[in-house]
Amino acid sequence: MGSISYKDTETNLTAQQTQSIETTSTIITEEFRSEEKVLPNETPEKQYEFATSFLKVGDYNMAERAFKEFVDMNSNHKLAGNAQYWYAETFRIRQLYTDAASAYLEGYQKYPKSEKGPINLLKLGVSLVQIGEKDQGCLMITGIKKQYPEAKQSVLQKAKYEEKKFECKKEKS
């Protein structure tokens, strides 16, 4: 029968410690990288355009980071509501519906009068239904016409479609 000597145990322990240190180092490096700024030091309009460029090429992880950074840095800018909407879209596109719902809700609460307000509310409703919150989601979807009577016709039609698709009960006026 074989036996394990003290030297073998010590060598094995040293190898495990080295591996542990290397793993920890890698994790720290990755966390640090994710905190790096994405947007260029330009005007908010150029930053928004830059963030949008990631959507156009299908890099939704970078688009998420760029739009989040834009909203954090330019929360009072006229494009902030649009940026918040696109931030939410990066999650929806990747089927991360809980994150999408959270981001749409934040957009609806912070930027209700933005150009993207009506579609933001619609997508919030759809995302809520997709995560199992049908009653809440339907409430958002059926409330769009009341909340945004001047919304684009395409948004109102899409809301009607989603209302039927999810078999939402009509909101009583």
Where do the language-model regions lie?
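Acidic, proline-/serine-/threonine-rich low-complexity intrinsically disordered segments
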Residues: 1-50
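Short solvent-exposed coil/turn linkers within tandem alpha-helical repeat scaffolds
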Residues: 73-79, 110-116, 146-157
